[in-house]
């Protein structure tokens, strides 16, 4: 029996075990998938030996990279890993994001406001670059590459018709938290996309919905990146 899993913290919100267990059953694969919630990566070498492959989630998508034997070129370019197979790191988050947001985009959607600068954000940035879209980064720690939340003015909101939450804010169990942006400037011309998928309607998306915006959660992104991860493990 091949063993798979997901490493991160927290994992109580994760759908991955259910998703992959069902997939293994449907495809007649002799495998199991478990959750490996960890406070750090001190036993990552042991896990890499024990598991044929695994997913990596918050907060380890970047910090796991030095432990890997090899890294795929795309994951290296992104600067984050969410899939490991036999010690090699890959990134399928960008595929999941690109394929899940594309059906919801209008011709007028050209500029994207990305909330957060972590591992998921890096995959989103890469996907948008492949799609030919421009973006502005927002960080709790503004720098030469990212503005701060205090810098999000009405003009910034109006000039970015797509807002993507790449932070864990609003994720179970902290369902009432949300990124501190001026939601009063969101209109029905906007698309709010949340990479969080549990709960399905986060506080961030509820604010957008109340303003008439299109809203999309991260559930399709999860499944699409998982399908791409499965293909890596299978092949």
Model-flagged regions — what are they?
Residues 2-104:
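Phosphate/diphosphate ligand-binding glycine-rich loop within oxidoreductases
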Residues 8, 91-94, 101, 105, ...:
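Glycine-rich adenosine-cofactor-binding loop
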Residues 10, 141, 198:
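Residues in the short beta-alpha loop(s) of Rossmann-like NAD(P)-binding domains
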Residues 53-63, 120, 168-171, 198:
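Short glycine-rich anion-binding loops that position phosphate/pyrophosphate groups of nucleotides
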Residues 99, 115, 214-235:
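Active-site capping/gating segments
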Residues 130-147:
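NAD(P)-binding Rossmann-fold cofactor-contacting core
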Residues 145-216, 220:
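Rossmann-like adenosine-cofactor binding region
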